[in-house]
Amino acid sequence: MTRRTTKQLIITLIFFFVLSGFGFLVYYLSQPALSCSDGIQNQSEEGIDCGGPCPPCQLVYIKDIEVLWTKAVASQGDFYDLVAQIKNPNPNYGSGQVSYQFEFYDSENNLISQSKDLTFILPNQTKYLLQIKIASPRPISQLKLSFNEIEWQKIEDYQPPQLFIQQKEYRLLSSQELGFSQARGILINKTNFDFDKIDIDILLLDSSRQLLAVNATEISALSAGQERDFVATWFKEITGQVAFVEVEAETNIFDPSNFLPPEKGEPEKFQEY
């Protein structure tokens, strides 16, 4: 190899390395910065955009509560019963304290007012929200439901509480009885736990399953395996023909005070969420 050929080869190699370095620099600078929203599992993440320097994967994959429907049912005078059905799509996450608010609007879509309350929701639960006898100075045409930020709690191997309703019935009251109509039934606690409070929501539907009226009551201090009668009374005449009665029983398993102290032995595993 002549001296001139060697010189040409060296110049060619230098030119190649300069172009390669420039190309690598352009490629590096054109790459998006690593983030927790780039859709790529990088920067020591445990999953895509979660774990490591990003939020925990279980929090990233938690879904919002779904609002299935809402309705304002006219009650006595200027009062309404506000009703919604919601669903928690998360199989192992729930919350013992969920802050929510109903906003109600008139026929011209003007906000009339709002009503706030607290509830709880269990993993994978579909439930009703009821606010009874809420005052409104104008007729309610539209009802909206929203939630504040929820502090989720995880339950491993969750099984829903076995609370059953039997012998439910609805009847009109006689003139000798106080009120217009009444729903009743038997609540059975088939869990292994003694609960301090169990909520019962009652919905009356017509033959088209349109909501006519709602009511609510509660059962206190129901032991494991025990059953208890419940009654709810409507004092105002209900417009429409009642064809179906839906009754939902639920209890807050996230509240330690809701579990009555066992007489013997250690607390059940169900409380260890």
Model-identified regions with their sequence ranges:
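Terminal connector regions
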Residues: 134-174, 231-273
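Cysteine-rich modules of extracellular adhesion/ECM and protease-associated proteins
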Residues: 8-60
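The feature marks the first
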Residues: 60-116, 130, 194-196, 203
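Short structured motifs
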Residues: 65-72, 86, 113-117, 130, ...
